[in-house]
Amino acid sequence: YLVERRELLAGQGEAAPEKIPEIHLAPSKLIPVDGTLLRKLVGDKTPEGDATEMAHALYNAVDGLMKYDKPEANAGWGRGDALWACDARFGNCTDFHSIFIGACRDLKIPAKFEMGFPIPEKTGSGEVGGYHCWAKFLSNGRWEGVDISEADNNPNLKDYYFGNLTADRVT
């Protein structure tokens, strides 16, 4: 297959439709939208500002709370159960981004998952080892990407992974 790689840069996310589907503000089976996640994540320090500023505060809070870990002895991780992940304080990309998405929705910021695969940085080499997910939130009419689990794995790139996503992915 030929894959066109394109880095997603802050402020250049895909344009959102004028009417945002309600699903991007609604709870799901494993992501409540009733204030519980927000309280667990930031306590009484509710983020303020515009959507980007509030999402950035949530991004930092999730990164501070969670550790990327997939222990074989604990079967709870990887399901995207946001409350479980908040309490366990570890998990994979699905767990990190479930918390972020739920907290964004608690603040009335539309947010969604983007599922796909990480691909090797060098074209034509390596293998795809498994799925990865990212989160996107709506700001200024555009879907902005975040990768909090990669920020946790690569602290030197923490600032980059808020608003930017590498070209090394297929979604």
Regions found by a protein language model. Name each.
Residues 49, 84-91, 95, 125-126:
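A short glycine-/small-residue-rich loop at the edge of a beta-strand within enzyme catalytic domains
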Residues 71-75, 93-99, 132-134:
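A broad, low-specificity signal for short, low-complexity segments enriched in glycine/proline
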Residues 58, 89-104:
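Active-site nucleophilic cysteine motif
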Residues 1-87:
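Acidic low-complexity segments
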Residues 98-171:
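Hydrophobic/aromatic-rich core segments of domains that either
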